[in-house]
């Protein structure tokens, strides 16, 4: 499987990552990526930037080191209502919005509460993908949430860092189940390194192996071509990005 997009990456701006966007783009080019989503942590995460940072991504060039740059965020799910920590005015400036649970922002609660939060954030229409949903601290009704994700064309991330055992320990078992059920339901999958250092960009080996284990069709993995990824954004109701015309 050839993956040409990394949809989950962090820069210095996240507060606990160690590279600039230029360093990340250089690494992406060196590793053969065509598109890179830059997705720093949203404001409620300790150390994260103000929402102006995300709005101001409009000043970023569309290409750095010949790699297309998608302006994104890893937003925090705040509550069971499915609210996220950016104002609605930020939405127009963002190409790619991940929604994730993080312990400092949403304390682990019951399976019912996690499920409600995920269903509501999907239905909000503000997010494009659920991030590292295999975290065992946040059990949820996998079938209900993935059915909802399919209905609303929200992708499910296979997070490589979650599969290493170094972060969110125990995620591998739940990630396996999520991919298995996701195949049956027919959700869209995406692959994210969750890189917090430039050398981790495009480190997707474990995510790819899991998708291959369940023989997920490439047309359901939106990172296997620039066309699949960008057309998924159109499916989500996003406007076409003129600078990427040749990549559709």
Curated annotation (Swiss-Prot):
GO terms for biological process: bacterial-type flagellum-dependent swarming motility. Its cofactor is Zn(2+). Binds 3 Zn(2+) ions per subunit. Its EC number is 3.1.3.-. Keywords: Hydrolase, Metal-binding, Zinc. InterPro entries: Phosphatase_YcdX_put, PHP_dom, PHP_phosphatase, Pol/His_phosphatase_N, Pol/histidinol_Pase-like. The keyword Zinc applies. Pfam families: PHP. Zn(2+) 1 binds at residues 8, 10, 74, 194. GO terms for cellular component: cytosol. It is an enzyme of class 3 (hydrolase). Zn(2+) 2 binds at residues 16, 41, 196. GO terms for molecular function: phosphatase activity; zinc ion binding. Belongs to the PHP family. This is Probable phosphatase VFMJ11_A0091.
């Amino acid at each position: 499987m050839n993956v040409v997009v990394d949809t989950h990456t962090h820069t210095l701006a996240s507060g606990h990552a160690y590279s600039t966007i230029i360093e990340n783009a250089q690494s992406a080019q060196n590793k053969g990526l065509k598109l890179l989503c830059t997705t720093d942590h949203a404001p409620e995460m300790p150390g994260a930037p103000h929402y102006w940072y995300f709005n101001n991504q409009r000043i970023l060039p569309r290409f750095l080191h010949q790699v297309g740059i998608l302006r994104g965020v890893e937003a925090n799910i705040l509550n069971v209502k499915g609210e996220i920590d950016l104002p609605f005015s930020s939405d127009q400036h963002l190409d790619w919005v991940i929604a994730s649970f993080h312990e400092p922002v949403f304390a682990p609660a019951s399976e019912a509460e996690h499920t409600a939060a995920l269903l509501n954030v999907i239905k909000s229409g503000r997010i494009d993908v659920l991030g590292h949903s295999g975290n065992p601290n946040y059990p949820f009704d996998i079938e209900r949430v993935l059915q909802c994700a399919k209905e609303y064309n929200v992708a499910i991330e296979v997070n490589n860092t979650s599969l290493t055992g170094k972060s969110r320990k125990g995620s591998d078992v739940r990630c396996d189940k999520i991919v298995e059920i996701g195949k049956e339901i027919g959700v869209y999958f995406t692959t994210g390194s969750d890189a917090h250092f430039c050398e981790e960009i495009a480190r997707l080996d474990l995510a790819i192996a899991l998708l291959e284990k369940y023989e997920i069709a490439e047309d359901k993995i939106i990172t296997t071509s620039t066309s699949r990824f960008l057309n998924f954004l159109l499916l989500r109701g996003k406007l076409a990005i003129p600078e990427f015309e040749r990549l559709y």
